Amino acid sequence: MIGCIKTRLRRFLGDETGSAVLPFALWTPLIVGIALSTIEVGALTIRTTQLERSLDETVRTIRLNTDVAYTHEQLKTMICEGTSLLVGCEDTLRLEMVSLDMRDWVDPASRPDCVDTTFQQVTPQRAFSQGIAHEMMLLRACYMYTAFSPASYLANALPSDDQGYTAIIATAAFVHEPSSGGF
């Protein structure tokens, strides 16, 4: 009886059929996770680059058109028109423009003003001032987006709110040039 069990056990341990299934089962989740994270990094890079570029172009327009006092909605529209891949840009982009006093420095708020995705209709505007000639201004844009693949390792590592939105923040500082009309 014991000899029969030993023989069967030896035969089972010596059999190599199906041995490729184990490495496949162990490595596949890792490789798929890395592939999804690579796609997520690419999508994040494209979104960040588009937001930064559009914000820079908008700041350039503000600096060159010194006689115009742009509103929050006008600047948001200008930024969103300068991007093509920021899905729902008008709804999930929030701008914050504050003046910076170089002689009596006070740090701007460490947390950017972002859209509250739980109550999109009731998000108050925290800080948006036009500024005057020769004044240093900080313009911060916060775009909220959902991850391309929530199952990727990167999407799990990025900070997100309760609805699964992650923030991309772009910042630009500029000085209002003197204008003939002033604002």
Question: Which residues make up each language-model segment?
Answer:
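Short, conserved structural patches
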Residues: 3, 56-183
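Alpha-helical assembly-interface signal, strongest on the long, hydrophobic N-terminal helix that forms
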Residues: 1-83
